[in-house]
Amino acid sequence: MHILTTTSASLDDLAEPVDLRQTPADVVALSFTDSDLSGLAAAWKADAERLPSMRLAALRDLRHPMSVDLWIDSVARHAKVILVRILGGYDWWRYGCDQLAAVARERGIKLALLPGESHDEDLRLIEGSTLPRAELDALLGYFREGGPANMTALVKRLARLAGSDTAVAEPVRVPKAGYYQPGHGVVPLPLEGRVRPQAGGGVLRDTRRHPEERPQEETLSPVV
């Protein structure tokens, strides 16, 4: 009988080294999600002339340790502010977190390591960051609410951290459900009192018309 030799490898081990060839910037942001990066890019481009320079990168391109080292040497170590949002938390980008934490402390960089899941708390990310806990919570709040207005406010807050005199706005709550009314914008759809539990499980919707409701023939769509 022959015993087969087996080996295991993580995604980081299987990834190929990549040199992103980015140039340095005052503000740097990394994320696993395209929606984060596209939202930040749009917000920065809308007011680029008055904002500090910014670089964005996808964490999926920085999975190999050599890729991380190259990027830190060419970009991160020259930044004033670095924001990283990690889907899956510390364990999904352990090497990058550790290296950035060391460089940030060595060079006095403001580092925010945030969880990708907005309601989760990862103490290892908090400990690796150089910003106060209150500032980390505030930065995460923009992602938690989402939307163009909050991405714009987030970019301005990062600019302020980088030394700009840009005015800072707190995260704005975005309705979890609603509909778009031409000429008025997004109209929230109140959820309180609209459903009630039934015996044996499930819920029963309150079908009574409310003043803010649209006629039944018009379709209500969730706010994205």
Question: What is each PLM-predicted segment?
Answer:
Residues 1-194, 205-207, 215-224:
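An N-terminal assembly and electron-transfer interface module characteristic of large anaerobic redox
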